[in-house]
């Protein structure tokens, strides 16, 4: 496939690297004023979970090719802080054409998203990967390092339920990279649920340690049953906020059972999972985009307040988190 990655962020670069390794043609679109536009190559350190549950540490180089045309088979969009409307404005201004794969945190309903995407065929996904980019000390770097991890699956809407013509090709793209597809009942609901759970994790870690050093905050959280028990209690509150959007949580009980056990018992299971699962632990350590972490918390917080949902522990932790910024 001919693939355009919007930007040069962690998620786009990670999957772009994998797509290129699998033989696809991958280009990146960067604004003229972007400080990343001079980057010609990424040094990649990847904890690869596609063939091993523990992950295999690999090293590689990713040569960056900038966009050279307007028509692509797939346009891969992963943007932080929910700035999808700004990205769509740029896509329209550049007159890019192709199926859009939108894979980022979004706190929107389907009607709003459809209006935003008007004129384009799109499909929603969500990456199961994470990492960080390091540019060194240059103001206009020519090289950078990508430190990332990737799991063996990717969340994707059922291609038969969306109006794209090349759904089979999109599925085959991931298959060519040895990545399995998981297809939730409703991708919008799945993303909202994912953000609600993450908001609980972020606020507990941030209130305890601050998130300016997100790796330290993650370490402390993963090693503490006390903090993990707080996460469980707050997830119960943020799930009520998700339900206030009209999402039927009863349909998701099989995925949420852990949060309905006694909090200390759930915390024990979570701590054991972090201790045993190298990939999960690593993705927690690497997620350091503070603005995006705050965006997740604020989306859930604002929805709860607007809908008058009682979530006292969550609201208090958000205030403590902001006080430590």
Regions found by a protein language model. Name each.
Residues 142-157, 208-221, 276-287:
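Helix-loop-beta segment of a Rossmann-like dinucleotide-binding subdomain
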Residues 232, 236-325:
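NAD(P)-dependent Rossmann-like dehydrogenase/reductase catalytic/cofactor-binding core
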Residues 1-53:
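NAD(P)+-binding Rossmann beta1-loop-alpha1 motif at the extreme N-terminus of oxidoreductases
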Residues 107, 113-196:
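Rossmann-fold dinucleotide-binding core
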Residues 178, 182-183, 217-221, 303-311:
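Inter-helical turn/loop segments and adjacent helix faces that build the functional surface
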Residues 55-142:
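Rossmann-like NAD(P)(H) cofactor-binding subdomain of soluble oxidoreductases
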Residues 20, 116, 175, 243, ...:
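Anion (oxyanion) recognition and catalysis
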């Amino acid at each position: 496939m001919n693939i355009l990655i919007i930007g040069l962020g962690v998620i786009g670069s990670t999957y772009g690297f994998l797509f290129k390794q699998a033989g696809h043609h991958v280009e990146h679109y960067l604004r003229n004023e972007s400080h990343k536009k001079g980057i010609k190559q990424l040094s990649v350190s990847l904890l690869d979970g596609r063939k091993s549950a523990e992950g295999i540490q690999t090293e590689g180089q990713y040569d960056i090719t900038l966009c050279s045309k307007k028509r692509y088979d797939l346009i891969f969009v992963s943007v932080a802080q929910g700035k999808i409307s700004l990205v769509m404005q740029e896509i329209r201004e550049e007159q890019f054409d192709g199926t859009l794969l939108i894979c980022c945190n979004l706190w929107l309903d389907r009607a709003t998203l459809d209006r935003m995407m008007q004129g384009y065929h799109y499909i929603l996904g969500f990456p199961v990967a994470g990492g960080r980019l390091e540019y060194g000390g240059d103001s206009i770097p020519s090289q950078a390092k990508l430190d990332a991890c990737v799991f063996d699956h990717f969340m994707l809407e059922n291609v038969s339920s969306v109006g794209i013509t090349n759904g089979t090709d999109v599925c085959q793209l991931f298959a060519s990279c040895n990545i399995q597809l998981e297809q939730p009942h409703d991708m919008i609901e799945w993303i909202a649920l994912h953000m609600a759970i993450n908001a609980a994790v972020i606020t507990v870690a941030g209130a305890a340690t601050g998130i300016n050093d997100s790796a330290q905050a993650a370490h402390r959280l993963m090693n503490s049953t006390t903090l993990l028990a707080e996460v469980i209690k707050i997830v119960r509150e943020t799930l009520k906020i998700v339900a206030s959007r009209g999402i039927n949580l009863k349909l998701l009980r099989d995925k949420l059972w852990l949060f309905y056990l006694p909090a200390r018992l759930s915390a024990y299971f979570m701590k054991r999972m972090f201790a045993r699962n190298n990939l999960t632990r690593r993705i927690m350590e690497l997620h350091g985009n503070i603005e995006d972490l705050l965006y997740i918390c604020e989306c859930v917080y604002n929805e709860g307040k607007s809908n008058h949902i009682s979530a006292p522990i969550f609201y208090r932790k958000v205030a403590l988190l902001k006080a430590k910024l």
